[in-house]
Amino acid sequence: LTVAQPGRRRPTEVLPLPPDDTIRDLAARLSPRIRLGASTWSYPGWAGIVWDEGPYSEAVLARNGLSAYAQHPLLRCVGIDRSFYRPLTEGQYARYAGQVPDDFRFVVKAPALVTDALVRGEQGQGRQPNTAFLDPVLATQEFIAPALAGLGDKVGALVFQLSPLPFAQLQRLPLLLERLRALLRALPDVRGATPDGVVAVEVRDPAWLSPVIAPQLAAVLKETGATYCLGLHA
């Protein structure tokens, strides 16, 4: 029989590192329109920076580290990547929202279900064409609607990360642009529903940024009110 000792932290509890005055002063000088954050809150290497020395495993941080992360004065947003691999429910989003302050925002990836032209195996290899690629109905039902309902005013950017395309699709980018236009037009009004929310598009093929296609992509985003997500992979 093991009896917990008073005052000792539970093994799964993640405690924030109290920020010093330098960090607080720096955060106070930042424009409220600038939000710094990371793509995850589960990095063990932040011990002694974001949370106390721990040590904490990645699994413990993934489950219990969000609240501690959100208490750091400089970290006012974070990414949710797991939504890319499987759609999340309204309840799952709501649980995230309940762990952070009102002024915190989430950057959420749309599921590969609607952003990848291929159905992929466990190692990332393409197996077959994805018939749900850029499907506006599924994008709304499986992503936009539950994210808005669960995160509420804490929605930051809802990102459609377009995965690398097969060669045949790369030869038909003008047609894909029209499908992207139709998708973005059909989505609920994220800007109107939230204080800071935007729909964003990230591309993973350099061909999207060619002299011919890039102006067309920019026109689609401008017309539909979407934002370009600058990434390092195109």
Give residue ranges: language-model regions.
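Residues lining hydrophobic/aromatic ligand-binding pockets adjacent to catalytic sites
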Residues: 1-234
